[in-house]
Amino acid sequence: MTSNARNGPLPPNPLANSGNNRDISADITMAEQVVRPESQTQVENSSTKQPNGQTKPMSASNAKDPLRPRRKKAKRACFACQRAHLTCGDERPCQRCIKRGIQNSCHDGVRKKAKYLHDAPNEALMPHLQGQLYTQTNAVRNNMSLTSNGSNSKTNFYPRQNSNFNGYYATKNDGSLSQSQLHDAGRPDTFPSQSPVSPTFSITANSATSGNQNMPSSLPASNGNASGQAQNGFGSAFFDPCDPALFNFDLASMNFGNHYGALEFGMLGHMATGAGDTPPSDSATQHGSVGRNGSGTFAPGSNFGESPTAQPSFLFGDPTIAGDWSSSVHTRNIYNQNMNHMSETPHAFAIESGPANFASPNSIESPLLTNSATFDDNTTSAYQNRSSMNPMPPQRQPVVSTPQLKHLQLSKRRQRNPSAIYESVKEPYSYTTGFHSLTAFIQRRFSTQNTLRIAKALASIRPSFIATTKTLNRDDLIFMEKCFQRTLWEYEDFINACGTPTIVCRRTGEIAAVGKEFSILTGWRKEVLLGKEPNLNINTGGSSGSTSGTSSRGSFTPRAGMEVNPSGRTQPVFLAELLDDESVVEFYEDFAKLAFGDSRGSVMTTCKLLKYKTKADTDMLPGNTGGTGGGDGQSAASGNGHVKVENGMAASNGQAQPLSQPQRRWSRGGIAGEAGMNQLGFKDGKVECSYCWTVKRDVFDIPMLIVMNFLPCI
């Protein structure tokens, strides 16, 4: 047996049948190229060339090489790359679509809308194709409308500027847009949703629509010239809320992925930076001026500006007017008359498309109540039959200026000048005298135990006061008082605007400012609290009687007149005079912790405020042992001391007795208005409240003032 037979059959010769093998391998290679995915082809193409001329496929280590060129991240991928989850570029068409031969269909992919963009139309979110279709279609429509009118230059819509936003969007030639695309883009029925209307309308007696010319103009030519001048002077971008050139928006620097987000961000920034820069003028209110005559049609000369002859204009996007029109039955019919024009611009839902006026007049003085911007039942027929509608002669409407209303409300505030504080303060405030007066009052009113607790609390912060004030000279103390008065000047505006009972006192506890709500709640008048009038209060919250005027240390003598300190100033009321004994002790214990502690800290707890009661008030109240209930000298006190006063009769033990003096009406029922607030705590002289207070320091880190807010517990 030979070796070949022993070892088995010989392997096939590689050179044998070389032609057949070559054909089979070629077919396999062609099939692999057809079936092979594009990603594998890209891997083979991304090969590195060796020095000997051979190619070597890129390995995983080379793919992660930090020195390899990185592809720039695109702002938005095209539709094909987005569906294939591949990296795309900013250019259109992208390189991948060019390699695949589908560059003609390369366009931006559709992103998932954010929640706050659900109400926005899809066309406004397309930064490339649809955005330019919107802009260019609107320009073509406006040009066609202007040329069709001929000599009649009066139109309801002002033309907008053709802005392609080259700084942000990829430029596209105008010739690449076919006429069918422009026609389809201008049709409102091709859009899935309608955007809120925000173009500017100029309502004049001889206004003519640009879509149809069924309504003839029959007024003199002088009005037409005036309207034409107004159009030339205020046309294009001035009244267009969707044009970024209106507010000098640089959309490229905002780095937004869509037109809508960039305009919204720019509008918010414009409102935030220019809120206080607009001076109160008549031109600032003309965007919200609406008037109507007796027939239900809008007529000129009925705006609320100071000039009755000014050209009236209004915005459909104005929220103050849209609120009145939202309840109208025929609102949809009115809008449909010019819906073709309204759907052309990529509305960005601008909050304000004109100069904003932040005046907020009272509801009874609002111009929208004096001249209602509503339509009667014949409005629809009047718009449909325009050929039969003749211009009505303008009727003079009452002129109400919003800046004048704003001036009436803020006239008192504008008269205040903080410069007067720096000119009037010439002497430092004597806090030493204030602390001495506080010590004398505490020893006179409180018991020995409570006085000791208050003294310990004040003694704990006394070294800190000495350390912070020992290096201050006279000029520093004067500057400290100026800082206090300047800060108090700001807090007074806050107190007047806030409806919460509020008081502001110095670190000594002397009242420096008070709100009218606090006076209503407690009965303490502002003049009494500030020391401008005598303090005749005898209510100290003692346990021996509700209003007997006694305390734990015996009788408390009220101030017969305005107490004058040795420094020559009147003595304001101390905070300790407004609270009961336990509340005062708790306050000073908390004040010792917060005075030099957390500069931003606050304390929230409960307290009992003392009502302001004089001897005359005590005598007027039936049920008090020292009071008189009627003119016959008999006491009108009931067994439990609960007496209800109604209609000048004191009901005691089921019997009504006439009262000789005016009585305070109080009951355990509901609370309404100032009278109801005044009833709180009138029986026992205490009002249970929850209050929050904080300490504000000056530039020397010394407690300067204490701000306290109260809310009664009802």
UniProtKB/Swiss-Prot annotation:
The keyword Transcription regulation applies. It is found in: Nucleus. Pfam families: PAS_13. GO terms for cellular component: nucleus. The keyword tRNA processing does not apply. Residues 78-106 bind DNA. Residues 1-71, 176-228, 274-312, 539-567 are annotated as: Disordered. GO terms for biological process: cellular response to starvation; gluconeogenesis. Keywords: Activator, DNA-binding, Gluconeogenesis, Metal-binding, Nucleus, Transcription, Transcription regulation, Zinc. Residues 545-555 have a biased composition (Low complexity). GO terms for molecular function: DNA-binding transcription factor activity, RNA polymerase II-specific; RNA polymerase II transcription regulatory region sequence-specific DNA binding; zinc ion binding. Residues 38-62, 191-228 have a biased composition (Polar residues). Belongs to the ERT1/acuK family. Transcription factor which regulates nonfermentable carbon utilization. Activator of gluconeogenetic genes. This is Transcription activator of gluconeogenesis UREG_00958. It comes from Uncinocarpus reesii (strain UAMH 1704).
